[in-house]
UniProtKB/Swiss-Prot annotation:
PROSITE patterns: SSRP
Function: Required for rescue of stalled ribosomes mediated by trans-translation. Binds to transfer-messenger RNA (tmRNA), required for stable association of tmRNA with ribosomes. tmRNA and SmpB together mimic tRNA shape, replacing the anticodon stem-loop with SmpB. tmRNA is encoded by the ssrA gene; the 2 termini fold to resemble tRNA(Ala) and it encodes a 'tag peptide', a short internal open reading frame. During trans-translation Ala-aminoacylated tmRNA acts like a tRNA, entering the A-site of stalled ribosomes, displacing the stalled mRNA.
Name of the featured protein: SsrA-binding protein
Species of the source: Enterobacter sp. (strain 638)
UniProt xrefs under HAMAP family: SmpB
Record InterPro entries: SmpB, SsrA-bd_prot, SsrA-bd_prot_CS
Pfam families for the chain: SmpB
Main subcellular location of this protein, as a coarse class: cytoplasm
Keywords of this entry: Cytoplasm, RNA-binding
Lineage, top ranks: Bacteria, Pseudomonadati, Pseudomonadota, Gammaproteobacteria, Enterobacterales
Superkingdom of origin organism: Bacteria
Assigned protein family: Belongs to the SmpB family.
Protein's cellular compartments: Cytoplasm
């Protein structure tokens, strides 16, 4: 009988795109797999990924992740050229691709990468259909966030 693998404590999140939530209204989220090369998986295991400027584009019925930066490790393969910002194919089923294509065709919508994380042994990216925020929307979100912090502080001191 084989032993069960012990789950290692810690976060499965590799990278977050905090700027996306600040600059866009996220209307719908999808989980997609990534087609990666060996050196990219090693870099992700080391946590050397940045998705702050990444977005998704659809070409010929397939989805691709642009602008994601996976920094190669110093010990990566020497006989293979490592391109840190290469275009990576997203693995989605046909229904999800058609849904994304229909939403992107509407004016003002885009698809951005929200987070990069491990799910079991597979690397997944959470993408979101987004619409850009205006400056006044960003200000109102900031005021709401500050009010929530103040409210929590008031409630904490009210019980004393």
């Amino acid at each position: 009988m084989t032993k069960k693998k012990v789950h290692k404590p810690g976060s499965a999140t590799i990278a977050l795109n905090k700027r996306a939530r600040h600059e866009y209204f996220i209307e719908e989220e999808f989980e997609a797999g990534l087609s990666l090369q060996g050196w990219e998986v090693k870099s992700l295991r080391a946590g050397k990924a940045n998705i702050s400027d990444s977005y998704v584009i659809l070409i010929d019925g397939e989805a691709f992740l642009f602008g994601a930066n996976f920094t190669p490790l110093a010990v990566a393969s020497s006989h293979y050229v490592c391109d840190p910002i290469r275009t990576r194919k997203l693995l989605l089923n046909q229904r999800e691709l058609e849904s994304l294509f229909g939403r992107i065709n509407r004016e003002g919508y885009t698809v951005v990468a929200l987070s990069l994380y491990w799910k079991n042994a597979w690397c997944k990216v959470k993408i979101g259909v987004a619409k850009g925020k205006k400056q006044h929307d960003k200000r109102s979100d900031l005021k709401d966030r500050e009010w929530q912090v103040d409210k929590a502080r008031i409630m904490k001191h009210a019980g004393r």
